[in-house]
Amino acid sequence: MQASPLQTSQPTPPEELHAAAYVFTNDGQQMRSDEVNLVATGHQSKKKHSRKSKRHSSSKRRKSMSSWLDKQEDAAVTHSICEERINNGQPVADNVLSTAPPWPDATIAHNIREERMENGQSRTDKVLSTAPPQLVHMAAAGIPSMSTRDLHSTVTHNIREERMENGQPQPDNVLSTGPTGLINMAATPIPAMSARDLYATVTHNVCEQKMENVQPAPDNVLLTLRPRRINMTDTGISPMSTRDPYATITYNVPEEKMEKGQPQPDNILSTASTGLINVAGAGTPAISTNGLYSTVPHNVCEEKMENDQPQPNNVLSTVQPVIIYLTATGIPGMNTRDQYATITHNVCEERVVNNQPLPSNALSTVLPGLAYLATADMPAMSTRDQHATIIHNLREEKKDNSQPTPDNVLSAVTPELINLAGAGIPPMSTRDQYATVNHHVHEARMENGQRKQDNVLSNVLSGLINMAGASIPAMSSRDLYATITHSVREEKMESGKPQTDKVISNDAPQLGHMAAGGIPSMSTKDLYATVTQNVHEERMENNQPQPSYDLSTVLPGLTYLTVAGIPAMSTRDQYATVTHNVHEEKIKNGQAASDNVFSTVPPAFINMAATGVSSMSTRDQYAAVTHNIREEKINNSQPAPGNILSTAPPWLRHMAAAGISSTITRDLYVTATHSVHEEKMTNGQQAPDNSLSTVPPGCINLSGAGISCRSTRDLYATVIHDIQEEEMENDQTPPDGFLSNSDSPELINMTGHCMPPNALDSFSHDFTSLSKDELLYKPDSNEFAVGTKNYSVSAGDPPVTVMSLVETVPNTPQISPAMAKKINDDIKYQLMKEVRRFGQNYERIFILLEEVQGSMKVKRQFVEFTIKEAARFKKVVLIQQLEKALKEIDSHCHLRKVKHMRKR
């Protein structure tokens, strides 16, 4: 508003009222004051009047003077605010207050001009008078001019607000502003806050726009700041405004107004005048927010979208070349849009009413020029109902009724705001029906007072224990959301379909120092994939892989986050989460999903375990893996007999003493730790495509380091290091009679005296296991009786007579070939174990050789097989004794042949 050069002139004397002038009536209309002609006419004909008429004329002049003084007190004009009255969404043309007139009827107060309204009608006799002339020096004394109005905005230093109830304005419920004595509140670290119902409250550094009934009022655009107010920035007063259905535009933005997808040719706002170019050099950014309009800041070119359709003629031109250097000064150009492009510097926020987004309600963030407010301990906070609230170091997405609002992703904090953490200002926010994330903790979701099984909270890391001592709590409440840490790249999904243009890029490299400053970056999202540092994962829906949902792993440049002690954790609903050193496979409803095998950790991450960084995860319907513990699975409160896990080994007890618990709970899924090779079986049949590769050679030393490799699976066989194990179901025999692969020598100490697998360490129903006793058959009972034969074969013993190997038991009944083959297969497996056994007591080997069923040729083959096994393990004494037994067999065969020839 331009001030008149006559605003400060003295009142016009009564004798000069005969001059033509314009005055303001109470309804704001201009009227020519022709009554003064009547006064002049009366003066010319005063000789014709009586003395009584002269008294009447003097009285009339006095009344005219009094009326003029009354009118003088009715009009109020301020320096910096221009306001327009709206009635039922339509501007009332005769209620616009013009600027100060050039005549002396206006009284000027310092900062406010207002008009009182009742029931949408102006009350002519209820205009609040401005400050009297004797109070002009109050501004020099530091006392501002304020007022409180009904149904109008109230302006203090940095806040203007209006209270609403049940969607209807309450005319008497306008909150008054701070008293004059509170000017120094900024110096006394008292923030400027307010509470409102159904409306946004804006503090120091925020510009916001209000919408009613989801319809913008297109004709209510407020003028931008005038050039003569540029020096206000130098005095530390930021240009702000809070408006009821209006757009607010600041310094350096050209924009174009759109209505119903069509450009309005006469609504284009001109750009800032040339005199304002230097404002950018002074550190004042160019921001704007408007209804259904495009807003473009420094470095961005964008296109407006309506109903997912591009508007071809609404493309805004890019920034002029003179502004290109802003990128070099560290000011990023980011963009978040709700079917429209709305760009701010650091954070964009969107308001939602009745579960519907209002596309033009984006709030701009703190201006770079106002960074010193943080030094004065003034936080930038706001409290809103049913709206999103964003603070400094948080990126979050708003949810309503469990459905994601796809375009409401907020960008992260820019580097300029990093020092806020050093000033002791924590990042907090409070939201209604939205997720709130704080420092390092995520917690489970509760619905209807019932806990959801997939919402196990991870423990606070040891590095964060001191937060409790600093009286900073780490808590959050969530509704159907996940928590993501530093170095995450994620993809947004809607209704099981990927949104190709909604991938959020990783944190920029210049933000890497935020981790060193102890500032976490977290976000909360619903129904999205969450990936941590060293993980590659794949999403499944209804046992079907979604081929296009593979998330790439963390970039190599983010590896140093681990060195800074920042763990990689995530909690997800209906998605797979994989931690550091784990290879796992997903099972659902007892059926394997063949395409869901996760790749193992690359070799570069092996040393993470040595640095004491634990890998934990919590998942729903997926496998969860911890370091060193396996535990028993319980189904319907009953233990599954084949799934009993051994307790933690002794060397893991020190973890409990250190306060780090390793626990895991699983439901019908596979859990595998470090060095596991496993094979999947379904319905007793081997699934040939589901064999996992063995542990690489570099992992063999894990056993020597005291780290056990175990796994527990449901309905499947589990194999550790170099042992191949096969599960039997329904008494079915595998195709081979015995396992062809043998255990490597490194695993002898692990197996110890453990029994072989159930399918291989026992005979059929008619036999008992072989032992050091000889099995003799009882003809009368068709059973094997246990007899004792004392064989003592050692290195120092004399040569052993092995005639028993070539002799048959008298009265032995005939055994079927199938049964004989089964016995011989079991004997062969037992011979392999006995040859490997440590020591030089070979008595049981010869007992087993005596039990071989078949001809002398078969027995000779078994002796030769045993010699080969002994040669593998370089058992010279056993080889010598077996060669003697082989000679006995040969001589016995020769003797039988000679006897047979004699009988002829």
Curated annotation (Swiss-Prot):
Record's subcellular location: Nucleus
Compositional bias ranges of the Basic residues kind: 44-64
Keyword Ubl conjugation: yes
PTM annotation (Phosphoserine): residues: S45, S64, S238
Protein name as catalogued: Sarcoma antigen 1
Leader sequence residues: none
Main location: nucleus
Tissue spec. comment: Expressed mainly in bladder, lung, head and neck carcinomas. Not expressed in normal tissues except for testis.
Alphabetically ordered keywords of this record: Isopeptide bond, Nucleus, Phosphoprotein, Ubl conjugation
Bilayer-crossing regions: none
Cross-link (Glycyl lysine isopeptide (Lys-Gly) (interchain with G-Cter in SUMO2)): K778
CC terms in the record's Gene Ontology section: integrator complex; nuclear body; nucleoplasm; nucleus
Region (Disordered): 24-72
Protein biosynthesis found in the keyword field: no
GO process terms (BP): snRNA 3'-end processing
PANTHER family on file: DEAD/H BOX POLYPEPTIDE 26/DICE1-RELATED, SAGE1-LIKE PROTEIN-RELATED
